[in-house]
Amino acid sequence: MHDNPLGTSLSRRALLAGSLGAGLAMTAVDRSFASPIPTVSDSTLSTAALTVLATTDIHGHVFDWDYFADAAFPPSDKGRSSAPLGVSRVATIAKQVRAEQGADSVVMLDNGDTIQGTPLTYLSAKQPDKLGHDEVMARAFNLVGYDAANIGNHEFNYGIAELFRYHNDLKAPLLCANVIDVKTGKPLTQGSLMLTKNVAG
């Protein structure tokens, strides 16, 4: 059992009872001074559809290709959580959904773990001059037209310089709210983003 830093004995039961009492007391506060919640009549409301497409754990798969077997992954490969995969397939789906919904009615996001996982991304990190200098996943994501991407833990596998090469080559904002630059004390990249979309109603 840990020592109580307050120097007093406080049981869990007493703490819960006190918290409950404080919570009930707060509900009795006079709210007459508060601004009324504005209401909107049904006649002024309109609806619109916003489609969010998100990818995660791409792990360097630009194509649905097994570089070690030099062949496409079989559709029912039991070693994978889903089949098929690859940014090339994502691009096909994104193009189709944008055509159906309207391009500005679609938000395209990636949740990270992107720049590591295949011989292609290894080559991009270790010998970029062999692939035209651009980070390969940034190039692929730029062609798909992502609106934003997040940093995953595997973005650090090849070092900070490679992470920032991806960041600099990526046209979409790269977001991360929980990694701080120790030199500046500031977030490594921007932590959030507001997107403006003109959604057809």
Language model features: what each stretch is:
Residues H2-G201:
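Acidic, metal/ion-coordinating pockets
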